[in-house]
Structure formats: C-alpha cells, structure tokens
C-alpha cells in the first residue's frame, strides 16, 4: 500500500515538472490573491543554508502593475539599457556549452516563428508578457552565493507550485532590468537587491507559447562513479 502511494506522489511530481514551461504571453484573466498567497506559501517550504530563508517576495498586480508596465514601455521605447541590481554579465562569461545553448535557443526561436511572430516575441517582453501578476524576489544586499542558490530553489518551488495550481509562469531578466521603476511602485527598500522576476497568469493561445526549449541529454551533464 505504501509503495503505491509513494509511486503515485512521484508520478504527480513528474507531471508537474513536465507541464511547467515558460509562457511568453498571458490572457488578461487575473490570478486571485488567495491563489498568489498559496503559491508563495508552498514555495516557502524550500530549503536554505542553515534555514536562513534569505528571500523577500513582492507581487505587483492591478493598478500597481499597470503603472510599472506603462513606465516599462516608455523606457523600452527610448531604448534605455537595462541596469538590473544583479549584473547578468556578458554572454562570454558563460561556459562554451552555455553560450552554445543560448545561441541555439535564439536560432530555434527564429526558425519557430515567422517575422510577425518574432516581432510579437520581442514586443510581449517589453510589455511584461501581458501578465496580470509579477512576482519579484529580493535578497539583502551583500548576499552570499549560497543565498543566490537558495533563492533559485525558492523560485523553482514557486513556479512548480503555480503549475500545480493551474497557473502558468515565466522567469525573465526583462522583468527586473529597470529596478528604479520597481522601487517607485513597490515598497522595496534600497538595502535589498531585486534578483529575479517571475510573471504569473494564464497562458494565451498565441503561437509563441507552443515553443518549448529542448534539454541536454542526460549523459552530457551526468557522471556517476
């Protein structure tokens, strides 16, 4: 009996992992506050270094998010370069394999979409993917690398919780590249760095949402000795 229950739980988790993918355009349907709270509550079960739980979470919805979106569109329209609190670095800072994967991703997007779709792909980023809610994850300034690791686990837990509750998501640098706009509209203090944004909502029927990026073969990343 225990074995059957255990296998059932594992299969459910695998299904959630397989279902989660980056949704690049959302419907206007709102995500209820109760659902948002439940998503974050589940993510709070994530582990951290000596239970430090270094994360803080801010969610923009409604008029607040629309004010952010309007300012975002204006900055993008002026081609203002992003200046995120956590420097993303240059592509050359990534490993050769990482650089190849990123190049392959952009090439695949170009082949997947026609010119009109590709233009929409770029446009929806600048309007925050049309999302009705954006989660912003922060860390105290002078955070350690372990805290970044912990926050990554928290973010993944949050997206898996969202998936399990029927809510789609996408984590993106685009969502945090103008931190001054976020601080103008959210109670994020200067002694916290805005590390990542995760858009939440319900996926639209746009063609771009059909794209799913491939994963490396297991033997390319795994060594068992």
Region spans (language model):
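Acidic, surface-exposed loops and disordered segments
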Residues: 2-225
């Amino acid at each position: 009996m225990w074995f059957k229950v255990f296998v059932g739980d594992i299969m459910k988790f695998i299904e959630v992992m397989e279902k989660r993918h980056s949704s690049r355009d959302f419907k206007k349907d709102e995500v209820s506050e109760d659902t948002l709270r439940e998503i974050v509550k589940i993510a709070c079960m994530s582990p951290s270094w000596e239970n430090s739980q270094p994360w803080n979470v801010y969610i923009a919805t409604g008029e607040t998010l629309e004010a952010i979106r309007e300012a975002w569109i204006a900055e993008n329209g002026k081609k203002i370069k992003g200046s995120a609190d956590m420097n993303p670095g240059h592509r050359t800072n990534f490993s050769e394999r990482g650089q190849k994967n990123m190049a392959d991703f952009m090439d695949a997007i170009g082949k997947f979409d026609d010119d009109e779709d590709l233009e929409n792909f770029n446009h929806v980023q600048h309007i925050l993917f049309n999302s009705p809610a954006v989660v912003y994850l922060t860390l105290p300034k002078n955070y350690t690398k372990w805290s970044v690791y912990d926050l990554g686990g928290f973010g993944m837990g949050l997206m898996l919780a969202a998936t399990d509750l029927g809510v789609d998501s996408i984590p993106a640098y685009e969502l945090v590249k103008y931190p001054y706009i976020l601080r103008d509209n959210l109670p994020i203090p200067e002694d916290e760095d805005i590390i990542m944004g995760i858009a939440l909502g319900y996926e639209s029927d746009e063609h771009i949402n059909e794209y799913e990026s491939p994963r490396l073969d297991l033997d390319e990343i795994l060594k068992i000795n």
